[in-house]
Amino acid sequence: MDTIANLITSIRNAYIVDKKIVRVTATRTNENIGRILLQEGFIKSIREHKDGQKSFLIFTLKYRKKKEKRITLKRISKPGRKIYSDFPNMPKVLGGMGIAIVSTSRGIMTDREARQKKIGGEILCYVW
């Protein structure tokens, strides 16, 4: 089960049907990706919710202007085909307008942070 793909699909589908919140399974990876989306201003808030023994993350979506109201998320590295990049060849999403979320040896971070720290890693997804 690919929890990152589930997270991306849930957020994408919620934007399509104008939902305000998205509930996904709480994993450390999903929490870190959510933290990055929150820092970069793509979502409004994140909170954790426990339902019995299961934990969920609840994302409150942020809508932009009426014309351009949804963000685009694209899964890059998949379980069947991992995509890695070293820091000099780290891709710039839309010429720097978007971000790449990268899993490195020092945790999950944006492409900008990875370039500053001069480390490469697995490119999880693009967000713009």
From Swiss-Prot:
The keyword Lipoprotein does not apply. The keyword Chloroplast applies. It is found in: Plastid, Chloroplast. Keywords: Chloroplast, Plastid, Ribonucleoprotein, Ribosomal protein, RNA-binding, rRNA-binding. GO terms for cellular component: chloroplast; ribonucleoprotein complex; ribosome. GO terms for biological process: translation. It holds the Pfam family Ribosomal_S8. Gene3D superfamilies: 3.30.1370.30, 3.30.1490.10. One of its GO terms (molecular function) is structural constituent of ribosome. InterPro entries: Ribosomal_uS8 (IPR000630), Ribosomal_uS8_CS (IPR047863), Ribosomal_uS8_sf (IPR035987). Belongs to the universal ribosomal protein uS8 family. One of the primary rRNA binding proteins, it binds directly to 16S rRNA central domain where it helps coordinate assembly of the platform of the 30S subunit. HAMAP family: Ribosomal_uS8_B (MF_01302_B). Part of the 30S ribosomal subunit. This is Small ribosomal subunit protein uS8c. The gene is rps8.
